[in-house]
Amino acid sequence: MEDIKHYMQQLGSEARTASRAMARADTETKNKALRAIATAIRRERDTLLAANAADLEAARRHGLEPAMLDRLVLSEKGIDTMAEGLEQIAGLPDPIGEMSDFKYRPSGIQIGKMRVPLGVIGIIYEARPNVTVDAAGLCIKSGNAAILRGGSEAIQCNRALAAIVHEGLAAAALPASAVQVVATTDRAAVGELITMKDYVDVIVPRGGKGLIERISNEARIPVIKHLDGNCHVYIDESADLAKALRILENSKTQRLGTCNTAESLLVARSIAQEALPPLTAMLISKGVEIRGCSETRALVPQAKPATEEDYYTEYLAAIISVKVVADVDEAIAHINQYSSQHTEAIVTENYTNARRFLREVDSSSVIVNASTRFADGFEYGLGAEIGISTDKLHARGPVGLEGLTSLKYIVLGDGEVRA
């Protein structure tokens, strides 16, 4: 344990030193590093595929569940996507050094704000090798240093990616310690990382609810996180049914295992008799199990009874909870009680109800007449994202480059002194 503690503190010390160099780096230098990493990823395609094959073989040997195995796979297309993602990040505006909100004070001084890096970011994630590259790219562009602790299932691929990232940093004369991958699979390393408040400024966990709850409870450093994605679609009394069908189909059935997939359907009572049968028939035709309230079951004989727990549940499966509500008031109250504050959508032609939904629903993304699946950094024009935050302080919603920065006040004067 002492060896792990010493190893992690060494990583932290090196990251803190590197963060100062990254904060000074200009946009051209950072973009040069990103493009060099992208080039090396394409060149080392065979190395990465071999490393991933070794990880997959070990994972199968240890009985890793199919869903995790699926996330672990790195394909030829996945390698191209990683490289393209870095090039896209290089093409994004650099937020560092951006100045705003300048105003003169009666004393003669000028006050404004400057956007600066957070410093050292610890990122903890499970079996997705692409997160290593996405996280490294976003941290480099935003002028931060990163300590990456990927899942033990992907250790061979992550080590290979770390070598590639270091090559790209060196090509731009940036310190290799600006991006460090934790080389040990010992879980004690996570415990050390989340308590190194002298070296690490923020932790970003990406993974299952159990991992994120543990980190949130034990960290001594601020955490940017979301626990789960219990997202809702509410069909208002004025909804266009054709729109509602398209939006619900995409929100629930496009991909079952994502955090922005709809897990609960609410329908206004005044249109339930007209809307619920076709909405649920569409879902059932896609293999989705309906778990509904008594009013839902009266209209949809195939529906199973919904429990209180169902309304809190992120299924990540072909299941949806359904409830008939009186109106937009009850829909908002239900969502604010049961949701995970991730993403909620209303389908409505009523401007007043849409405005109320936007103002009163307490989630990180609130959507009118579009799919919950749009809650994504790429779709929001942020480029890649490091995660989604359902917290209210610092970053909220998809966390891209700007979410990895902070603001400091700057004061400009010409010899003024305080009276």
From Swiss-Prot:
EC number: 1.2.1.41
Family matches, as Pfam families: Aldedh
EC class of the enzyme, as a word: oxidoreductase
Function as written in the Swiss-Prot or TrEMBL entry: Catalyzes the NADPH-dependent reduction of L-glutamate 5-phosphate into L-glutamate 5-semialdehyde and phosphate. The product spontaneously undergoes cyclization to form 1-pyrroline-5-carboxylate.
Keywords: Amino-acid biosynthesis, Cytoplasm, NADP, Oxidoreductase, Proline biosynthesis
PANTHER family according to UniProt: DELTA-1-PYRROLINE-5-CARBOXYLATE SYNTHASE (PTHR11063:SF8), GLUTAMATE SEMIALDEHYDE DEHYDROGENASE (PTHR11063)
Gene Ontology molecular function terms on file: glutamate-5-semialdehyde dehydrogenase activity; NADP binding
TM stretches of this protein: none
InterPro entries: Ald_DH/histidinol_DH, Ald_DH_C, Ald_DH_N, Aldehyde_DH_dom, G-glutamylP_reductase_CS, Glu-5-SA_DH, GPR_dom
CDD domains the UniProt entry points to: ALDH_F18-19_ProA-GPR (cd07079)
Highest taxon listed in the record's lineage: Bacteria
Gene3D superfamilies per record: Aldehyde Dehydrogenase, Chain A, domain 1, Aldehyde Dehydrogenase, Chain A, domain 2
Species for this entry: Methylobacillus flagellatus (strain ATCC 51484 / DSM 6875 / VKM B-1610 / KT)
Pathway annotation from the record: Amino-acid biosynthesis; L-proline biosynthesis; L-glutamate 5-semialdehyde from L-glutamate: step 2/2
Record-stated family: Belongs to the gamma-glutamyl phosphate reductase family.
Main localization (coarse): cytoplasm
Gene Ontology BP annotations: L-proline biosynthetic process
Key word DNA damage present: no
One Gene Ontology term, aspect cellular component: cytoplasm
Reactions that this protein is recorded to catalyse: L-glutamate 5-semialdehyde + phosphate + NADP(+) = L-glutamyl 5-phosphate + NADPH + H(+)
Places the protein is found: Cytoplasm
Stated name of the protein: Gamma-glutamyl phosphate reductase
